[in-house]
């Protein structure tokens, strides 16, 4: 469904991509490697090692072999509880402590990349923060909070949020850096043409917003009365629950990306009105 209305030359199963690239690399100008196993509740490390680490190494090595520039998806999950802040400084990568095997697999690849002597002539890894936007119907539990908020409000008329279990945060005041997928695409498109300043970058708006802000904007976009309930954060994740994430995007700006990002209000309004209410995908 995500491919409806889009233009593409070939659909290649992931297990055949290396052989496909061997035979077609002259037709390829740029590689975006964004696919991964992203389930933060999956604890089978073998799956992450195969799909997120070893597969990504293969893509990197093919890009080196054929002289292809590469952009790949890292993740803000690499930052763990933010003990070292949220700076995309290469020097802190070896010291980061992700909270789950997914985040660990992403950080392991970042570490591997920074150790490589042979690199594509241009490469960039992007630590995506909380991305939301069209074409996430297939993602189940791992879809964005905006998507789940819309679904919950549509089905029950209300929205449940985790209450705070810390004195320095009020209920619903936990913050995330929510970034609209159109902004993500714009940044990647910019680097496809820029092809300078290789490195690992944060990709968020640089402005953390509360879950209350998010919920209220979804209610407003749906034209519904605001009914928000607070529930306990499950005990098994309470100690590892992030209360604040915010991308430091100064490095992105220094690389020349100057466009404004969608505000949470703008992004949610467009996403709900243009895609969720009519049940449409981008391209339909």
Regions inferred by a protein language model and the residue ranges of each:
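Glycine-rich NAD(P)-binding loop of the Rossmann-fold in SDR/ketoreductase-type enzymes
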Residues: 30, 43-58, 100, 104-105, ...
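Conserved Rossmann-fold NAD(P)-dependent oxidoreductase catalytic core, especially the SDR/UDP-sugar
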Residues: 30-33, 57-99
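Catalytic loop of short-chain dehydrogenase/reductase
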Residues: 40, 87-103, 132, 170-171
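Active-site Tyr-X1-5-Lys
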Residues: 84, 97-129, 148-155
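Conserved beta-loop-beta element that borders a ligand/cofactor-binding pocket
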Residues: 75, 111-137, 159-167
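NAD(P)H-binding glycine-rich loop region in Rossmannoid oxidoreductase-like domains
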Residues: 5-8, 14, 20-51
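C-terminal substrate-binding subdomain of Rossmann-fold SDR/epimerase-dehydratase oxidoreductases
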Residues: 153-284
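Glycine-rich "substrate-gating" loop/helix at the edge of Rossmann-like oxidoreductase active sites
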Residues: 99, 129-143, 163-181
């Amino acid at each position: 469904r995500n491919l409806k209305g889009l233009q593409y030359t070939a659909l290649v199963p992931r297990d055949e991509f290396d052989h496909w690239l061997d035979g077609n690399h002259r037709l390829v100008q740029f590689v975006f490697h964004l696919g991964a196993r992203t389930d933060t509740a999956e604890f089978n490390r073998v799956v992450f090692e195969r799909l997120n680490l070893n597969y990504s190494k293969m893509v990197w090595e093919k890009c080196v072999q054929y002289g292809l520039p590469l952009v790949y998806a890292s993740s803000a999950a690499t930052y763990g509880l933010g003990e070292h802040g949220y700076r995309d400084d290469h020097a802190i990568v070896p010291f980061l402590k992700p909270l789950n095997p997914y985040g660990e697999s992403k950080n392991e690849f970042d570490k591997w990349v920074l150790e490589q002597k042979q690199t594509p002539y241009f490469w960039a890894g992007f630590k995506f923060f909380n991305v939301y936007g069209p074409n996430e119907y297939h993602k189940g539990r791992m879809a964005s909070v905006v998507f789940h908020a819309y679904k919950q409000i549509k089905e029950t008329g209300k929205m449940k949020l985790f209450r705070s279990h810390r004195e320095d945060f009020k209920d619903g005041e936990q913050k995330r850096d929510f970034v609209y997928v159109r902004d993500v695409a714009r940044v990647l498109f910019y680097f496809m043409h820029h092809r300078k300043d290789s490195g690992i970058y944060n990709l968020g708006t640089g402005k953390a917003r509360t879950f209350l802000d998010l919920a209220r904007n979804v209610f407003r976009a749906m034209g519904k009365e605001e009914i928000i309930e607070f529930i306990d954060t499950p005990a098994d994740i309470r100690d590892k629950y992030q209360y604040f994430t915010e991308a430091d995007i100064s490095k992105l700006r220094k690389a020349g990306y100057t466009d404004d990002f969608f505000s949470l209000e703008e992004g949610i309004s467009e996403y709900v009105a243009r895609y969720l209410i009519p049940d449409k995908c981008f391209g339909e």
